[in-house]
Amino acid sequence: MKLSAITLDCADPLALAAFYQQATGLEPHPKSDADFAALEGDNGLSLAFQRVDDHRPPGWPDPAVPQQLHCCFRVTDLDEAETRLLKLGAGKPEHQPNAGRWRVLTDPAGHPFCIVGGLAEPE
C-alpha cells in the first residue's frame, strides 16, 4: 500500500490550492475544479482539497473543533518562510509551543500547519 494523497476539507478548493501552490511550488493537477483540486508532488504524493459546504475550520488549540491532521513543511529559514507565508494569506495563532524549532501557522481555510527549520540548501 502506498500513500497517494493527503486531502483537506475546505469551502473553496481552488483558492486553497492556489495558496499551497504559491507556498510550495507544487504543480496544479490539470483536472482541478471547484469541487476538488490537487497539487502534484514529484514523488507521486498529491496534496488535495475537497469542497465541504458547511466546513468548520479546526482551531489551534481548541478542543471544541480540534485539528485532526496537520502537515509539516521543512524550510531553510523559519523567519523568512513565516514572513512569506503570512504575506500569502496564512495566519499565525498566538499559541506557539516551540517557536525556535517550528512555527504553527494556519492556511486561509483555517487548517493548522507547521514550518520546521533545517532544510539544507541544494548543492
Language-model segments: which ranges?
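N-terminal beta-strand motif that seeds the catalytic metal site of vicinal oxygen chelate
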Residues: 1-18, 22-23, 68-73, 116-123
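Core segments of cupin and vicinal oxygen chelate
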Residues: 4-53, 81-83, 87-95, 99-101
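Short secondary-structure boundary/capping segments
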Residues: 38-39, 60-63
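Mid-chain, well-packed structural core segment of small domains
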Residues: 63-86
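A short, acidic/glycine-rich surface segment
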Residues: 54-60, 123
